[in-house]
């Protein structure tokens, strides 16, 4: 595997997230309904748009991404973002899955008032993203400011017929989380959920 610096890997990951999740048309590629893009076309279009992209760089980003944001097709000819899409070109068909008792959502404290009014909504994305552990949710929340972890009563939601899915990288997905299924983060540190 070729050597790339952290900035180059992070910049490439952000670029891939942008074109494979949100705006494939920005460089002239088309994704299929499952989010797949032909790798040769992606590289060519990225280079035409002025972005340095090679197969070796793609391989490194896919292999080293701690969040496993991207995956290759079984034949190695296509790549996709595993989840997080806002483009209408993509509608990945995830298998429905029974969630654990609790899941977690990391957000910033500045968003709490809005969440208390409307719950968690997907916004521009297709799904609300949830984590199986608080540490991951805290990292997600920290991207937006002072992190706050909301506990989602996932099994209670599932018992009421609200579906959940899990992406290849372990991220849990659901369409929305009503306020009644949220536990607010005003518990002492270290308190365990039953």
From Swiss-Prot:
InterPro entries: Ptrans_KptA/Tpt1, RNA_2'-PTrans_C, RNA_2'-PTrans_KptA, RNA_2'-PTrans_N. One of its GO terms (biological process) is tRNA splicing, via endonucleolytic cleavage and ligation. The keyword Transferase applies. One of its GO terms (molecular function) is tRNA 2'-phosphotransferase activity. Its EC number is 2.7.1.-. It comes from the Bacteria. Gene3D superfamilies: 3.20.170.30, RNA 2'-phosphotransferase, Tpt1/KptA family, N-terminal domain. Pfam families: PTS_2-RNA. Coiled coil: none annotated. Keywords: NAD, Transferase. Belongs to the KptA/TPT1 family. HAMAP family: KptA. Removes the 2'-phosphate from RNA via an intermediate in which the phosphate is ADP-ribosylated by NAD followed by a presumed transesterification to release the RNA and generate ADP-ribose 1''-2''-cyclic phosphate (APPR>P). May function as an ADP-ribosylase. This is Probable RNA 2'-phosphotransferase. The gene is kptA.
């Amino acid at each position: 595997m070729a050597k790339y610096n952290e900035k180059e890997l992070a910049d490439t990951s952000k670029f891939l997230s942008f074109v494979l999740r949100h705006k494939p048309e920005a460089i002239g590629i088309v994704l299929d309904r499952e989010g797949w893009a032909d790798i040769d076309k992606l590289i060519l279009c990225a280079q035409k748009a002025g972005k340095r992209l090679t197969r070796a760089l793609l391989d490194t980003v896919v292999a080293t991404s701690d969040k496993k944001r991207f995956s290759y097709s079984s034949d190695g000819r296509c790549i996709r973002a595993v989840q997080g899409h806002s483009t209408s070109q993509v509608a990945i068909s995830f298998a429905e899955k029974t969630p654990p008792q609790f899941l977690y959502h990391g957000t910033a404290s500045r968003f709490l008032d809005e969440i208390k009014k409307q719950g968690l909504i997907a916004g521009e994305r297709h799904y609300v993203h949830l984590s199986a552990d608080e540490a991951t949710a805290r990292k997600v929340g920290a991207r937006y400011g002072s992190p706050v972890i909301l506990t989602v009563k996932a099994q209670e939601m599932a018992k009421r017929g609200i579906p959940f899915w899990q992406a290849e990288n372990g991220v849990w997905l659901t369409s929305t989380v009503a306020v009644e299924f949220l536990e607010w983060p005003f518990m002492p540190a270290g308190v365990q959920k039953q």
